Design a protein with these regions (language model features):
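Rossmann-fold NAD(P)-binding glycine/threonine-rich loop
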Residues: 101-135
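Solvent-exposed, charged amphipathic helical/linker segments at domain boundaries
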Residues: 1-7
């Protein structure tokens, strides 16, 4: 199933969503190691998440992916920055990417992309609740 060994993960975006993902303990319990947080904001670079994961510069992405043996990238940036981040992750050699940005990305055929759209998921739950409220199940 692909979860029989540890995999190194990198998170792009050290804002609130990225920091929350970096500090989520369930990743480590499931065999995923967050190797680094990456950001373009000089005010964030050099800081760490609450769990001690360093925020490194986006300009060092390729080197970090190579040195940390990163296999999976997580996009936790704004919608307007997401495509550039996706392209940079692919250029750095990643073939598996999880996208939290609320935008549909132009993808490469050799790359597996999974997107998490919180708005769509909330709309789905709201639709379900409306059915319950209307007497359907």
């Amino acid at each position: 199933m692909g979860i029989d060994r540890r995999r190194n993960v990198i998170i792009i975006g050290a804002g609130n969503p990225g920091m929350a993902l970096a500090d989520y303990r369930g990743f480590n319990d499931s065999g995923f190691r967050i190797a680094a947080l990456i950001d373009v904001d000089p005010a964030k670079i050099g800081r760490s998440s609450r769990s001690g994961i360093p925020v490194l510069s986006f300009s060092d992405l390729k080197r970090i992916v190579r040195e940390q043996h990163v296999e999976i990238g997580i996009i936790a940036v704004t919608a307007d920055a997401a495509q550039n981040v996706y392209d940079a992750l692919v250029e750095a050699g990643l073939n598996a990417i999880l996208n939290f940005a609320p935008v549909q990305l132009r993808t490469h055929s050799q790359v597996k992309l999974k997107s998490v759209d919180l708005r769509i998921n909330l709309e789905s739950l709201s639709f379900y609740l409306q059915g319950v409220e209307d007497g359907a199940s």
